[in-house]
Structure formats: C-alpha cells, structure tokens
Amino acid sequence: MSKCSRCLLDETVPELKINDKGWCQYCEIYDRLCINYPIGEKGQEKWNQILAAIKASKSKYNCIVGISGGVDSTYTLLQAKKMGLNPLAVHCDTGWNTKIAVTNIKKACSILKVELVTLVIDWEEFRDLQRSFLRSSTPDADIPADIAILATLFRVASKYKIKYILNGHSFRTEFMNPIGWTYYDGTYIKNIQKQFGEKKLKKFPNFTISEYVKHVIIKRTKIIQFLNYVDYSKEQAKEILVTELDWKDPGGHHHENSFTHFFQSYYLPTKFGIDKRKVKLSADVLSGRISRHQGIDELKITYPIDMQVVDYAIKKLQLSQDEFNSIMNEKPKSFLDYQTNANFISRVWWAIDFLYKIGIVQDLVYHKYKILTKIMKKKK
C-alpha cells in the first residue's frame, strides 16, 4: 500500500510515488512552492512588486477577483480593496449557488462598492454536461464548473482589457488536488459530452488549448494567487469577514455550491473511496497547523452526509433513482479511459517547461503537467 509518511495522501491517489524519505511527489511540490512563494518580509517584497504592476494598469479596473461567496474569494476581494486596487468582481453562476453564497457575494460587493459581473451558465446544457460526467464513471464530475469559471474569468478579463486575475487559492491551506482525483481539459469536456450527453454544447464556456494560448501566452493575462504571499489563516479571515462584511459561513469546505457539497461528501467517498479532506488536512499538516496524527484522527470521523443535499442533487439533475443507482454501481474509470489532451500535453512538455521558466505558465499548472507527463510516458 502506497502511503505518504509526511502528508495524508495514500493509495487512493493512483499516481502516488514515494521517495527514499517516505514522502510523496505532492509533498516535494509543496516544498518547492514554499521556496517560490515565501511569506514574511520576502513574501511582502514579492507581493509589493506584483501590486505595483497591477496598480500601473491603465484599464478602468486593474484586476479581476473571482468570487464564490466562500471565505477565500471573499477575503481576497476585501484585501484587494484595502490594498488600493480597483477590482471587478466576477461570479460564474452554474445554477448550484446556495442562498448564503449569493447573499455573501451581494453584501461584499455592496459594502466594498465593487462592481459585480455575474455570468449565468445555460442551465440545460450545464445540467446535461454534469450528467454526462456522472455517466462517464470518473471522479471528475465537478470539473465542468471549474472549466466554466476559468473560461469566464479570462473572457471577462479580455472584454475589459484587464491583465490580472486574483483568485483565492493558497497551496498552504488548499494544497493541490492529485491528478487522479481531478483532471480537466477542454477536449475531455467535449468528448465526454459527445459520448454521454444528449445536447450539443453551444453556449457552454469551454476552455480549450487555443483559449489558453490566446489568453495566457498571447495576451499575457496572469492569474495571481495573492494568498500565497501572506500568512493566511482561514479562521482569522472568517472572523474579519463576519465583522466587516456581515459574511455568513456556508458550512463545509466549498459548500457554497450545492453540487460540490453532494460531490465531495457523498459521490466521491461512496463510489471511489476518495476523501478530499485528505488534501485540505495535508495542507494543514505540511504548514504546521496540525500534526499528522491529528489529521489521521480527523479522517477517522466519517465525512458528514446530508441526504437532503444528495436528494436535491439527484432531483435537480433530473436523474431517476434507478439511473443514479446504476451510476453509483458502475465500475470506476479515469480520464485515461477517454480522449483528452493528456497525450498532446506530454508531447509538448518541452514547451511548457520553457514557458514556465520565462514566467508565463503558473507553478501549479507546471507541476501538475509534469506529473501528467510522467503518467502518460508510463502508460506508453
């Protein structure tokens, strides 16, 4: 059984590799990210340089902040305003927002006097796409939302001629989803829908390689993870948001979205034995907020399941109970069983490596694709 002796990742991560120290490759990536994104004085110096570049922008808005109503994105928006930035808040509505999340978004933008752009995804197409991914029997049923959000942020940035997108991800609190648990690309989206869907995707904002080249390489639009440069505490952030923005906690990790709540608490653990708390708790272990033993004890507690959320998801997706049961009983598969861009990415790894070295490709993208390239070479 493969199990990392440092974090909490184990044999449920198909690509897990253990080095001579007993650590996995994701721990090694964490260490590299700590070097690239220091906190304290060095982190502040790096952030000040980025902040100056953002403020030098001549656009009406000097940055975009993607907002979901959760703690990380709302805190990022608050800090952007406090640092003197003029952000445009962007929300991608996939039809699964909780009332608490919607209220949090509206209150934050109102109190901070930030303009909000909300793009509503075509529900009929999106529902059909989500059903397609459930029918594909892969653990990637939540990636249509990730793709839609990413595409939306870049397209809004292009429309308003904005070069910087701030997001609320921090590797110290969120770590990094293993590829075997979460893989996405535009070709994957197209082919899963073609194989399992009932509708053509005419309005869905897919994010293809050509879109990546257009926005990231040609237009040089950058995604900035502000929280990587600061000593970020979710609990302290929540207290600040409650006090300053009358923010309400949606509940669990990413439970501001009802589908993600269903997906992480029921679908993944029940069908695949995947517990995404391992990622979050691994971040807590590696950053020293808890001990590894505390993390292990936390995982012994069964992921709380709200059957009302499960029933709501099945009903909203318009799945019969028989079809849902069939989906849950189908043999698990992965992105490797379907047509994706993975082979292409592994073939052009030299280009990705070059673009990373000159500061165009993001750290997390680079490291994830490096692991992917090794997976694809091994597959051959």
Regions found by a protein language model. Give the residues of each.
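Short, glycine-rich nucleotide/cofactor-binding loops
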Residues: 63-72
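Nucleotide-activated chemistry modules centered on ATP-dependent adenylation/adenylyltransferase
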Residues: 1-63, 79-348, 353-380
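Hydrophobic positions on the alpha1 helix immediately C-terminal to the Walker A/P-loop
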Residues: 75-76
